Each structure stands twice: as C-alpha cells, then as structure tokens.
C-alpha cells in the first residue's frame, strides 16, 4: 500500500526541509544542505506515486550524508 503524500511532507518537515510554495497543489521542498529541491503534487490524503517516494528518500539520504560530512 503506497504512503500518503501527507506522510511524505511530514517526513520532509521533520528533517528540516521548508516548503517554498508552488502553484495549485504543487509544493517545492528545499533544505540548505541538499542540492536539489523535492517537488510534490497532490493533496495530503492522496496516495504517493513511486517517483515521489523515491525523490523524498533520495533527498533524505543526501541530507543524512551531508550531516555526516560525506561527499556525494
């Protein structure tokens, strides 16, 4: 069962990402220590698409590496 977009957004918020905004239901999440922003589109109760889950996982992994001081 796919996760909900609200769960992905909560994960990003907990990790220190901030919502830069967007048009409609699109949101761009960024963190000063992560090179790329994460774009999520949809309502909080919608099922997350596999590419959205992957983008969040990659961003959180990159943040973890940056906090440990490991280069990508």
Region locations from a protein language model:
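Polyanion-binding surface elements
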Residues: 1-19
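Aromatic-residue detector
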Residues: 5, 11-12, 35-41, 51
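Compositionally biased terminal segments of proteins
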Residues: 5, 30-36, 65-72
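Residue-level detection of beta-strand scaffold positions
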Residues: 13, 26-28, 60
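A short, structured beta-strand/loop element
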Residues: 17-46
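C-terminal structural segments of small proteins and small subunits
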Residues: 43-72
């Amino acid at each position: 069962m796919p996760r909900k977009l609200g769960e992905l957004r909560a994960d990003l918020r907990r990790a220190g990402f901030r919502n830069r905004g967007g048009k409609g239901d699109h949101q761009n999440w960024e963190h000063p220590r992560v090179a790329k922003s994460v774009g999520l589109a949809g309502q909080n109760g919608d099922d997350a698409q596999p590419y959205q889950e992957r983008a969040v996982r990659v961003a959180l992994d990159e943040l973890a590496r940056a906090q440990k001081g490991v280069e990508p």
